[in-house]
Amino acid sequence: MAISFRAAAAVILVLAFVASCGGEYEDRELVIMTHDSFDISEEVIKEFEEANDATVVIQKAGDAGQALVRAILEKGNPSADLLYGIDNTYLGRALDEEIFDSYESKMLDKVPDRFTLDDTNHVTPIDFAYVNLNFDKAFLDDAGIQAPTTLEELAGPEWKSRLVVQNPAVSSPGLAFLIATVAYFGEDDDYDYLDFWKDLRANDVQVKDGWSEAYYTDFSKNGGDRPLVVSYATSPAAEVFFSEVELTESPTGNVLIDGATFLQIEGIGILKGANSKSLAKRFIDFALDTRFQEDFPDKMFVYPVNRDAKTPDFFRFAQVPTQPADISPAEIGEKREEWIDAWTKVVLR
């Protein structure tokens, strides 16, 4: 009887040990769902893996909006542990759906308050960029025209058939630009954002589904016939970076109109039901460290939120708007679909 008791006790101890280790074994793989533009050096990911005895799996799920939709569909039983790339245009929907667990990173003291996405720390800011108009310098020089200094000018004859934008229903920069026009013109004034878009339609604005098609096909710098495109304030710097010859200035420029640029902040959140929560928390801390923060600017052409992180030298060809659109994530979350529906009726139908 004593032998049986000792044997049973041994079995219980073994089972208890296995159970206690089970979470650790599960914690060895971290799955990060993100957008297709996500790009971090393999050696940086490897550093995290080696430091944590773990494997990182990057799960790309389309653009930021598509990744969010997938995370919502998987709510409570996610295929990933983290969602990277949720920005302030989609933040409201993500918080309403309650797909994230809260986590306050110890590294947040390195992040200025203006990049805070939500006070409950369900989404942690990682990077930021500015969405605005870019212009083709050579085209404007040849045409003898100056870059616009107000959005109202875009509805004039000088800019007829010269602007390409992205569809805000399916494009992140397209949505950011739409939101900027809402902030700039308002919704209830004598001339509001929808009046502006009606005038743009009458002025033959071109609408494309994605940034790549608009920038690399229709933008005149890349062979198209439109010298104005919705892009990013870092795009002129990217033109210098990718040039086959050394440049002393960018062939493109930024149109930085007060109140008409959009500060886009990307963040990361731990998905509810994640298998590897402790590892996910460590990755968020790692993503805010300078090693990670200094790796992505020359790959994703966005700025680090860590105030101690440095940007590449070619970022001097980028510009930082002094007065981006003043509109809160809460208002965006509340009215985003309304704005998109109204825009679609005015511009596409």
Describe these PLM feature segments:
Residues 17-20:
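C-terminal motif of bacterial Sec signal peptides marking the signal peptidase cleavage site
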Residues 22-93, 222, 349:
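Early extracytoplasmic/lumenal segment of secretory-pathway proteins
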Residues 42, 64-100, 108-119, 217, ...:
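Pocket-flanking alpha-helical
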Residues 78-83, 101-138, 152, 162-168:
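A structural signal for short loop-to-beta-strand junctions that line the ligand-binding cleft
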Residues 88-99, 118-146, 174-184, 263-269:
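Periplasmic solute-binding protein
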Residues 100-109, 123-124, 152-155, 233, ...:
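Short beta-strand->loop
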Residues 173-255, 259-260:
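Ligand-binding pocket segment of bilobal, Venus flytrap-like solute-binding proteins
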Residues 266, 271-327:
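Mature extracytoplasmic/periplasmic domains
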